[in-house]
């Protein structure tokens, strides 16, 4: 256990060489990262890459089969799931949603809803909320009990571009107001929240890590989407020293092929290096669009997504 303290930048959770084995197959292996108080860490990768698995291992929902996870003693976690099973035919108000996991003082409920910008919707039925409003309700539910660590599993899914910007702005506000650490999971491989301190690209292991390039540096992006978008979103450029083959094996830069990519095999040096918080570690080069188990990465950026849809 990590020792309790109130200092800013205090480490909340740390993963060291973590692996999760299920059905004779490694879902993730050799995963290393940490989240400190006031820090935002974003996990990106294709579907099935181990993002949610790694996050669940970090907060103790999954027990790793190898490696070590250390957490702050008495760590309080707020969790916004990727999907929430709700019977939409039954009436469920925002107020009731806030107390599904237990009673909550009225003052704390009101404060959380106010922080999420939906205090006026406390009596609304959740099935009538838009995608963005529902995500705000889930976020209010997660922060109501004042967590040290906030885990957000694809929080901007089902919202349009402007809604995505607004939600990222909300996440930033929550971090600034509470000082909590944030572990954010995203399926978007190239466009991430600009306030992210560290981006970690996963595909069964840590493929690369670094800091995002601020979109605000691109005049074209600012002209197209405005300064608020430029201040909220950022571009992350990948640097992989290996290629994932269609059969799941890994082709390394030296021409060798292995069944997986693991720090101990000597091919993946940067996995074992701890990324310094705040260090400028941007990898600028073209990202191969078919290097993750044969998945096609050529997907639309955030600005070309369809309009706001229903929540999951």
Swiss-Prot record:
Belongs to the ABC transporter superfamily. Zinc importer (TC 3.A.1.15.5) family. SMART domains: AAA (SM00382). Signal peptide: none annotated. ATP binds at residues 45-52. Its main location: membrane. Residues 13-228 form the ABC transporter domain. It catalyses: Zn(2+)(out) + ATP(in) + H2O(in) = Zn(2+)(in) + ADP(in) + phosphate(in) + H(+)(in). It comes from the Bacteria. The complex is composed of two ATP-binding proteins (ZnuC), two transmembrane proteins (ZnuB) and a solute-binding protein (ZnuA). Residues 241-312 are annotated as: Disordered. Keywords: ATP-binding, Cell inner membrane, Cell membrane, Ion transport, Membrane, Nucleotide-binding, Translocase, Transport, Zinc, Zinc transport. One of its GO terms (molecular function) is ABC-type zinc transporter activity. Part of the ABC transporter complex ZnuABC involved in zinc import. Responsible for energy coupling to the transport system. It comes from Rhizobium etli (strain ATCC 51251 / DSM 11541 / JCM 21823 / NBRC 15573 / CFN 42). It is a peripheral membrane protein. One of its GO terms (biological process) is response to zinc ion. Its EC number is 7.2.2.20. This is Zinc import ATP-binding protein ZnuC. Residues 243-312 have a biased composition (Basic and acidic residues). It is found in: Cell inner membrane. The keyword Glycoprotein does not apply. It is an enzyme of class 7 (translocase). It holds the Pfam family ABC_tran. The gene is znuC.
């Amino acid at each position: 256990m990590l020792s309790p303290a109130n200092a800013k930048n205090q480490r909340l959770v740390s993963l060291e060489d973590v692996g999760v084995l299920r059905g004779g197959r490694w879902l993730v292996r050799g995963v290393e990262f940490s989240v400190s108080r006031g820090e935002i860490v974003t996990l990106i990768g294709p579907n099935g890459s181990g993002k949610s698995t790694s996050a669940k291992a970090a907060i103790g929902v999954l027990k790793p089969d190898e490696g070590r996870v250390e957490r702050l003693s008495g760590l309080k976690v707020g969790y916004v799931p990727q999907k929430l099973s709700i019977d939409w035919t039954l009436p469920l108000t925002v107020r009731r949603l806030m107390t599904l996991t237990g009673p909550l003082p009225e003052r704390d409920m009101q404060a959380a809803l106010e922080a999420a910008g939906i205090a006026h919707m406390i009596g609304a039925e959740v099935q009538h909320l838009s995608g963005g409003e529902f995500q705000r309700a889930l976020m209010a539910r997660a922060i109501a009990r004042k967590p040290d660590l906030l885990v957000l599993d694809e929080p901007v899914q089902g919202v349009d571009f402007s809604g995505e910007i607004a939600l990222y702005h909300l996440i930033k506000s929550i971090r600034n107001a509470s000082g909590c650490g944030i572990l954010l999971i995203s399926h978007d491989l190239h466009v991430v929240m600009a306030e992210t301190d560290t981006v970690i690209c996963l595909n069964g292991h840590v493929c690369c890590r670094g800091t995002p390039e601020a979109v605000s540096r691109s005049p074209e992006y600012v002209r197209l989407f405005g300064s608020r978008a430029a201040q909220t979103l950022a571009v992350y450029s990948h640097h992989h020293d290996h290629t994932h083959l269609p059969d799941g094996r890994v082709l390394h830069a030296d021409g060798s092929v292995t069944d997986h990519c693991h720090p101990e095999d000597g091919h993946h040096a940067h996995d074992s290096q701890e990324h310094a918080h705040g260090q400028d570690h941007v990898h600028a080069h073209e990202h191969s669009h078919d290097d993750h188990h044969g998945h096609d990465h050529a997907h639309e950026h955030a600005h070309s997504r369809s309009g706001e849809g229903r929540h999951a």
